[in-house]
């Protein structure tokens, strides 16, 4: 197994891609903290992790609030002693064309997607620095690389995540901490399953591989970047989007 006895924190781990990441890390030997605003669904992921024979802890948290992000990390360090892997997956959307976008929708998306990533990284880096090891994997998006109509706030937040990833990677390389990002494209989740056939066909036409990705595709990429096999990779954006990044 790639992650035997490692301790991982996965934000936004209650469902979808986050749940796939949490369960994949567990199958590779990691104990997993499932952090999410949705406490009930957190427990569902915890149950799946425990079915893999690993320890799991559910933490209800709003990562966009510093005291909550720090409190979560302090609790994990107190109860489990260390954090080896942080996956910043928590994210929201509030889509709308720029001229119609409400200011509160702009701020809400930036607060969770970008500031939340900053807060969680800031909270865990002192302990990772002390142990002189760690893996941080931030979930970005193809939208952060190429933009998308109706998603100015989301695109800005994910572009910010990419820049933040590269900066933290530079600042903490001397501490043997690697920091990378995974940029998913259109993934087959509950949201895409409710799209009309016409809209789904339009999405597929943008993807060179002509299929939606699976949550497991993203989870496998995160697992690799969290492992010793990726020990010489830092500051990288791994595109998991069926080739959309080159088609743009």
Predicted segments, located by residue:
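Residue(s) in the substrate-gating loop at a strand-loop-helix junction
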Residues: 141
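C-terminal helical subdomain
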Residues: 181, 204-229, 233, 242
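Active-site helix of classical SDR
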Residues: 121, 157, 165
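The beta1-alpha1 cofactor-binding region of Rossmann-like NAD(H)/NADP(H)-dependent oxidoreductases
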Residues: 39-40, 60-71, 103, 216-217
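Substrate-binding pocket helix/loop in short-chain dehydrogenase/reductase
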Residues: 97-98, 105-110, 203
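Alpha-helical segment proximal to the catalytic Tyr-Lys
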Residues: 126, 170-174, 231
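Short C-terminal tail/terminal secondary-structure segment
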Residues: 146-149, 223, 234-248
């Amino acid at each position: 197994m790639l992650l035997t006895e490692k301790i991982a924190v996965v934000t936004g781990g209650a469902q979808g891609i986050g749940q796939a990441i949490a369960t994949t890390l567990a199958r590779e030997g990691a104990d997993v903290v499932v952090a999410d605003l949705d406490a009930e669904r957190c427990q569902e992921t915890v149950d799946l992790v425990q079915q893999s024979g690993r320890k799991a802890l559910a933490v209800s948290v709003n990562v966009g609030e510093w005291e909550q992000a720090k409190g979560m990390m302090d609790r994990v360090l107190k109860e489990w002693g260390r954090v080896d892997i942080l996956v910043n997956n928590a994210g929201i959307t509030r889509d709308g064309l720029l001229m119609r976008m409400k200011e509160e929708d702009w701020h809400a998306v930036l607060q969770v997607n970008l500031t939340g990533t900053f807060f969680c990284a800031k909270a865990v880096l002192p302990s990772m620095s002390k142990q002189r090891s760690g893996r941080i994997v931030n979930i970005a998006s193809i939208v952060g690389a190429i933009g998308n109509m109706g998603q100015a706030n989301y695109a800005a937040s994910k572009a910010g995540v990419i820049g933040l990833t590269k900066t933290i990677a530079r600042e903490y390389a001397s501490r043997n901490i690697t920091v990378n990002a995974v940029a998913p494209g259109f993934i087959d989740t509950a949201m895409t399953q409710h799209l009309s056939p016409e809209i789904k066909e339009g999405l597929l036409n943008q993807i060179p591989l002509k299929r939606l990705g699976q949550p497991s595709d993203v989870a496998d990429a995160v697992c690799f970047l969290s492992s010793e096999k990726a020990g010489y990779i830092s500051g990288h954006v791994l595109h998991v989007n069926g080739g959309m990044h080159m088609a743009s």
